[in-house]
Amino acid sequence: MTISDKIRIYELSRDLNLENKDILDAAQKLSISVKSHSSSISVEEAKKIKNLINKKNSDKQILSINKPSNKKDNYKQNKEDKSPVISSVKGKPLKDNSNKKQLLNKPLNKPESLKVIPNQLKNPNKPNIYNSSQSQANLTNQNTKSKPSEHFNKDKKTFRNNTIPPIKTPAKPPIQLIAKPKNINNNLKSNESSKNIPNSGDKRELSLKPDQNRNKPKPKNSNNRRNTPELVGAPIRRDDPNKQNNKQNITFKQTVSNRPGTPNRPGTPNRPGMPNRPGLRNKPTDQGRPGSFNRQANPNRAGAPNRPGMPNRPGLRNKPTDQGRPGSFNRQANPNRAGAPNRPGMPNRPGSRFNSQKSTGIRKPVSPNELLQLQKTNKSEKDTLAKTNNQKQNIESPKQKAKAPASRPNAVPSSKKPPHRPFSNSSKKPGRKDWDDSAKLEALRNKNPQKQRQKVHIIGENDDSLTSETSGYSGEKISILSASLARPKKEKSEESKSHKSTKQFKKKKKETTRQRQKRRAMELKAAKEAKQVRPEMIIVPEDNLTVQELADKLSLESSEIIKSLFFKGITATVTQSLDLATIETVAEEFGVPVLQDDIQEAAEKTVDMIESDDFDSLIKRPPVITVMGHVDHGKTSLLDSIRESRVASGEAGGITQHIGAYQVEFKHESKKKKLTFLDTPGHEAFTAMRARGTKVTDVAVLVVAADDGCRPQTLEAISHARAAKVPIVVAINKIDKEGASPERVKQELSEKDLIAEDWGGDTVMVPVSAIKKQNIDKLLEMILLVSEVEDLQANPDRSAKGTVIEAHLDKAKGPVATLLVQNGTLKSGDVLAAGSVLGKIRAMVDEHGNRIKEAGPSFPVEALGFSEVPTAGDEFEVYPDEKTARAIVGDRATDARATKLAQQMASRRVTLSSLSTQANDGELKELNLILKADVQGSVEAILGSLEQLPKNEVQVRVLLSAPGEITETDIDLAAASGSVIIGFNTSLASGAKRAADANDVDIREYEVIYKLLEDIQLAMEGLLEPDLVEESLGKAEVRATFAVGKGAIAGCYIQTGKLQRNCSLRVIRSDKVIFEGNLDSLKRSKDDVKEVNTGFECGVGCDKFSSWTEGDIIEAFKFVTKKRTLTQ
C-alpha cells in the first residue's frame, strides 16, 4: 500500500494470488479506470474487485462438472427451493445477439450454471452425453410426489428471472429461453474427476406452472449418476451392465436449435423439452433429473407440444416417463397437456417411445443454413406437412435408408467402426401436429448437394482422458452388437453416387502457367504457319495502317516490317501509323500490290437495278463497256478509232480527265448493235473515277501496251473489274510499234490469273493497233460475244434508275450531271433524287449535243435541273412526286453532312511522327487550301493526290472542295482563313478577281494535275524553316605574327579562295581545331579591306583569339540557307 491508501494493481494481484490481467479484467468490468499493472486504485475499489473475483471463484466451483459418485446422498433436493419459471414469451421469438461459437476443449467436471436472461437467448456449447450404464441406477429412486425442478448453478453474472404465463394455443409454439454463460472455458480450470455439486442456497430452480409443480416428482439423490451431466469423448455405444437384455445403449449427440434460424452450439446442458437420451431401456421415467422438468410420458395429455425437427432417440424402450435426466427440466411427457408451448425447430429424439409408439429414426445434424430453409418452408407450406411426413417415413425405412449419427466435433476416433442404428417406422402421435421436417431436410440436401460441407472433427486435448474415464467405452463391446445394425452395402453405393454428383458441381481447375505457355506457343506456331502464304493484294483502309496491321495483312512478323523501315531510314514501332506511300513501298518490297479500301468499295456493285416486278417486261439492252488501263497505253486513241469509224465525222472527241460516255452502232451479223463506251482516265490520281466506271459496266476492256506490259494501274484495273464481277476483254495495243511483244504481255497477265484462250484459258485477248486501226472490228465482235453470254436485260416501261457518271457546274447551265440509265426510261420533267441532291429534269442532251426527250436503258445523257452538283458515283431514281423525293433527299443529306464532317476531321489528322515534329518545332504548320474544279471527279482526284503528300511537318487542310467556278464567297473565306485558292479547269465568276485583289488572296489556276500537285508541294516546302549549310570561302596560312596592343595580328597568305571580313573562321594547328569564331579585322597594307583573294597577303585579327603561331591554317566559311524539301 501507498501512503495515500491507494493500492497498486500488481499488489492486489499478489495478495489474491492472481495475474495482473485478471485484476485488470475485473476492474474493467466494474468500470474502474486503470491503465496498467502499476496503476493505483482506492481501497473501496479494491474491495469491489475482491468481491467480484471471489464470486467468480464460487462460480467456477459450481460450473465445474464432477464425475458422478456412487453415494446416494450426493444430491438432496430441497423442497423449499423454488425457482421462478422461465416460460415461453408471447409474441415474436427473441433473437440471439451472441455470434460467437464456443468449443469446449476440456471436459466439464461440474454442472454448468445457466444464466437466464429475458429477451435474450444463449445457445449452448455442447450437449451433455451420459453414460447410460452408470446413470440407470440413479433413475429408480426418484420421489414422484416431489416438486419438479431444474437446478441451475450460478454464473459469473447474476440471474434475472422472468416468469411469463404460457401460451394457450399451440398453433405456433413460442420458444423457451435458457441462457448459458458466454465463456465456459474461462470458468473451467479444474480437471477434477469426482466432485459433488454443493447444495447451497445459490441454486436456482426453474419450474413450470405453479399448479404443475405440486404434482410433479422430485428426484432422489442416492447413487444417481444421472444427476451429474457428463461429457464423453465420442458418440459411441456400449452395453448396459445392469440390463443384459439390452445389447445396444447408444449415446448420441443431437444438435438442437434453440430458435428458428439460430445455429446449434455444442456443450449445452439439457434444457426444457430436450428429448430423452438413448440407451435408457426399461428405465422408469418418473424420476426427474437435477435441473430438468419431470414430465410424465402421457401422450394423451392435453396441449402437450410436439416439437418439430426433433427425432426421438432410439433405445428408450419400456422406460417409465416419470423420471427426468440430470441437468434438464424434469417434466411429465404429456403431449396433450393444455397450454404447453410447442417449440419450433426442436426435433424429437429418435428411439424414445410414447405409449409403445415407434420412433421415426435418427437424423443428421442440421446446419444453420438448412435450418433457415426448413423454417421458411415450415411457414409457407403448412398444408403439405402431412405429405412431407409420409415421405419421411418412406425414406427412413429400417432396411434400406439407414443413416448413421453424426460424429461429435470432439470425438476421439475409435479403432473399430461402430455399427449403425436401425430405424423403426413410427406413425404420427394422436392429437399432435406433425412438425417433423426430416423429409424436407433430405429433400434440401438432395436438391443442393454442392452446399454440403464436409464435417470437421476437432479433437479436444482432454478427449483421451475422457475416453479412459469411460473405462473402455469405445472399444471392446461393440463387436457383440447385432450384425443387422450395420449399414447396408446399398447405402454405400448410394453415398458414393451422391459424392460423385457433388463432384460434378465443382468448377474446373484454372489453367496453370505451364499449360498457358504451351497453348500460346502452339497458337504462335499455327499463326506462323498461316502467315507463310502471302496475299495477292492488300487493301488499305483510309490510307493508313499501323505497322502491326500491315504485318498481319502481309502475313509477316511485325519485326520484318520494322526492319524494312529501318533500312529505309524510318524508325517505327508496332503501333505507329504509316501513310499510303510508305505502305506501298514496304508492300512492293515483299511483292504485294496495294489497293485503297474506299476504291475497292466504289468498284463493287451495290444496287441491283432490276426488281422482281420487271421480270415480265424485260428486253435486251446494249452493253456498257468501260475502257481501262495504264496511262499512255492508248485507251483514248483506241476509243477514238472506234468512234471515228462509227460516228459521223466532225464530232469533237475531247477526252481528257473526265469519264467520256459514248454510244456507237456496230453492224454484227447483218444487225445493228449499239454499244455504250465509258472512257476512264489512266492517271493514278483518278482511281476513284476508274472504280465508278467499273461499277456501272457490263464488260471491261483492259488496254495493255505491247511494248510496256503490265503496270500498276493495269493491276488496279484488274482488281476493279474483279470487284465488280464483270468479264474482262484484253486489248493488247501498239502491236505495230517496235519492241512490241504480245506474248510477253500474255505471260505477265497469266501471272494475274488472266490466261488467254489460245493458252487454254477463258480470257479473250485481241492484239490491236489504235493508230493503224488494226483488228478494231474483231475487238468489237469479241465484246458483243461476251456481252451476249451475260444476257443483259432491262425493263424500258418503268421509271428510270441509274448512276451518276460525272457532274460539274456550268457557268451558264448550272449543275450538270452525266447520267447512265441502267433500267427504265428517263424522261424530261421527271423528279429524281441522286444521293442527297434533288433534281427535276429540265433538259437532256446526248453525247453529240442533241437534245432528246427520253433516254432508254444503257443510254448516257447530260441532264440539267439539279438543285446542286450531285456526287459522281451516286445512284439516281425517279419518284412519282416531288414530296416523296424531297423526304428521301432530306434523310440522305443528314448522312452526307456527317460524312463530310468526318472527312474534314480526317484532313487534319495528326500522326505520331507529326506530333513529334510539332513538339520539336514548337508548332504544327498548316497549309489551308480552297479547291474548285470543273467536275466532281477532278475534285476527288486532287484530294486523293493531296492525301499522299508527306504530312510529317506540314499539314494540308482543305477548307472547301467543290466543282464549279470561283466565286466571291470563296474569296471571302480565303481572306478570313488565310487560304490559297486552287482552280482546276475552271474560271472566275464576275467580281471574284476584283475581290481577290482587294483582299490580297492568292488564286492559282491549273489545267494539268501534275503542275497543280507540284506547286502545292512547293508551297508546303516553303512553310518549312530552311536549313543552314556551311559554305567554304578559302584557306590561308599564317606566316608571321605581330603584337598590336593587348592582342596580336596574324600575317597570312591566301592559298585558295578568299577571305572576307566578318566571316567565320576555323584555326587548325597540327590537324586539330584550336579556335572557331569570327574574322573581326582584315587588313592589307594597313588598310581595312572587305576581302582578299588568292595569292595575296593580309593581316587577320580576332578579338577573342591572339595566340597565333606560324604554320597555323585558317579556314574561312559562311552559313547559307538551303531550302528544305518534304522528302527529307
From Swiss-Prot:
The keyword Cytoplasm applies. Residues 629-636 are annotated as: G1. Residues 679-682 are annotated as: G3. Residues 100-110, 182-196 have a biased composition (Low complexity). GO terms for molecular function: GTP binding; GTPase activity; translation initiation factor activity. Residues 654-658 are annotated as: G2. Pfam families: EF-G_D2, GTP_EFTU, IF-2, IF2_N. The keyword Amino-acid biosynthesis does not apply. Residues 499-519 have a biased composition (Basic residues). Residues 620-792 form the tr-type G domain. Belongs to the TRAFAC class translation factor GTPase superfamily. Classic translation factor GTPase family. IF-2 subfamily. This is Translation initiation factor IF-2.
